[in-house]
A protein has these predicted regions:
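Interdomain hinge/linker segments and adjacent boundary elements that couple functional modules
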Residues: 1-13, 17, 21, 27-31, ...
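Short alpha-helical DNA-recognition segment
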Residues: 23-43
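A short linear-motif detector with a strong N-terminal bias
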Residues: 38-39, 54-55, 100-103, 111, ...
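C-terminal regulatory/effector modules of DNA-binding transcriptional regulators
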Residues: 165, 172, 181-288
C-alpha cells in the first residue's frame, strides 16, 4: 500500500471538506497563507500522502475560519495521533510493510468482515495453530528464523477483540478450513475449541459455509473488509496472495466485496448451526 494511517486519511478528508465549504482552490489557500503552505503540501495533506504537523493544521483552520473549539480540538488530536507509533513497529525487522499496514488498519478499524476459504482467520487463531500453519507451508529459512516473533504478533493482533470498545468481527469460514490436516489433530481440536469460545463473545460472529454449498462468489478467494464507523468511505478490502497483499480502496470496488460478503452470509449456516458444526468437526479430530 504502504497505507497512511486511517487517522491521517480522516484528517485529509476533513481538511478537504473544510476547504470545499469555503469554495477555495488549492492555489487560493496557498496564496492566502502568504507562504505558510504550498499547493504541493496541501495536496499531500488532503490525500494523506504526508503526515500533518499541528502548526500547518492550525494555519489551515484559521484560513478556513474554523472557530468551533471542539472541532479544532478533534482535528488537532487526529494530527497528533496520525504520527503515533504502534506496538507492531517494534517488530519492524520481522514484518513486511504490507503486514504492518494490515495491523495498523485492524488497530483503527471498528469492524472486520472476513471470508476465509482455507485457514482459520488470524484474529481467531491459537498460538499452536499459527505456529504449525507457518511451518507446514514451506517457509524460507529466513522466515523460519522469525516464526517465534510472527506468532507473538499474530496473538498480539487479537487484542483488538478484547480492548475497550472492541472491534466487531464477523467471520465466515469454509467448512474445509475446519477439516484441513495442515496442522496436527490435537492442535486443530484446540483451535476449533477456540472458535467456539470466541464465538460466545458479543462482538464476534462466526458462520460456517458448508462444503456441499453450490458454487458461490467466495470461491474466488479469501478477503477481509475493514470498516471504520462514521467513515464508510474509508473502508478498505485486504486480499492476501502467496507473495503480496492487495488493498482495495476504491469505493465502488469495496462495495462489490461488501455485497459478496452479504451473499456468503446468507448462504452460510446460522450462527447456532455453525457452532454445532464446529463442535461436530472438533469431535471428529479426536482427543487431544
Amino acid at each position: 500500500m504502504s497505507t497512511p494511517t486511517v487517522r491521517r486519511r480522516r484528517l485529509g478528508v476533513k481538511l478537504r471538506a473544510l476547504r470545499d465549504a469555503r469554495g477555495l482552490t488549492l492555489e487560493e489557500v496557498a496564496e492566502k497563507s502568504n507562504g505558510g503552505i504550498t499547493v504541493a503540501k496541501l495536496s499531500r495533506l488532503e490525500t494523506a500522502r504526508s503526515a500533518a504537523k499541528a502548526p500547518d493544521v492550525e494555519l489551515l483552520l484559521d484560513l478556513y475560519g474554523v472557530d468551533d473549539r471542539e472541532l479544532r480540538t478533534a482535528l488537532l488530536a487526529l494530527t497528533r495521533e496520525g504520527a503515533r507509533r504502534g506496538w507492531w513497529q517494534s517488530y519492524r525487522g520481522v514484518l513486511s510493510p504490507a503486514y504492518e499496514d494490515l495491523i495498523s488498519l485492524e488497530a483503527e478499524a471498528t469492524s472486520v468482515r472476513t471470508w476465509q476459504i482455507g485457514v482459520i482467520p488470524g484474529l481467531l487463531q491459537t498460538g499452536e495453530y499459527a505456529r504449525e500453519l507457518m511451518t507446514s507451508i514451506g517457509m524460507s529459512e529466513a522466515v523460519e528464523d522469525k516464526v517465534d516473533a510472527l506468532v507473538e504478533v499474530r496473538l498480539a493482533r487479537q487484542s483488538v477483540l478484547t480492548r475497550e470498545s472492541p472491534l466487531n468481527l464477523w467471520a465466515i469460514i469454509a467448512e474445509g478450513a475446519l477439516r484441513t490436516r495442515c496442522v496436527g489433530a490435537g492442535v486443530m481440536r484446540d483451535q476449533l475449541g477456540r472458535l467456539l469460545e470466541r464465538g460466545r463473545r458479543p462482538n464476534v460472529t462466526i458462520q460456517v459455509l458448508p462444503s456441499d454449498s453450490p458454487p458461490h462468489v467466495g470461491q474466488m478467494g479469501s478477503y477481509s473488509v475493514l470498516g471504520f464507523e462514521d467513515y464508510a468511505d474509508l473502508d478498505v478490502v485486504h486480499v492476501e496472495s502467496l507473495t503480496a497483499a492487495l488493498y482495495v480502496e476504491d469505493g465502488g470496488q469495496v462495495g462489490v466485496y461488501r455485497d459478496a460478503f452479504e451473499r456468503l452470509r446468507a448462504a452460510a449456516l446460522s450462527v447456532e448451526a455453525s457452532a454445532e458444526r464446529i463442535e461436530q468437526i472438533r469431535e471428529e479430530h479426536g482427543p487431544r
